[in-house]
């Protein structure tokens, strides 16, 4: 017997179907495709897309944000260094894996907002390229 549940994980709501299994029951023949109910997130996105934010300026585009929470292992560049697009800037450890943070554009490093060993959250400013 399939039963539907709505669960919330990190603020996102998911609609899931679960099958009750007993020793005498037979497993379902077809896999169930998960569906997402993001009504709150969708309405937030519509509001954001309708009103351009003043923070979306050229300087915001030059700042590299952390893609995920983790710890900065190494900073590979210094302020004043010239970098090319896709050049590794630093190493971020997340979930016991090392991830390269690469330059999204060519330019000169004008500021480094983190140091080795520092813990960062997703979206934190890491480095600014001018």
UniProtKB/Swiss-Prot annotation:
One of its GO terms (biological process) is fatty acid biosynthetic process. It comes from the Bacteria. The modification N6-biotinyllysine is found at residue 96. Residues 20-64 are annotated as: Disordered. InterPro entries: Biotin_BS, Biotin_Carboxyl_Carrier/Decarb, Biotin_lipoyl, Single_hybrid_motif. Residues 55-130 form the Biotinyl-binding domain. Signal peptide: none annotated. Residues 23-46 have a biased composition (Polar residues). SUPFAM superfamilies: Single hybrid motif. The keyword Lipid metabolism applies. Gene3D superfamilies: 2.40.50.100. Residues 47-64 have a biased composition (Low complexity). Keywords: Biotin, Fatty acid biosynthesis, Fatty acid metabolism, Lipid biosynthesis, Lipid metabolism. This is Biotin carboxyl carrier protein. It comes from Streptococcus mutans serotype c (strain ATCC 700610 / UA159). The gene is bcc.
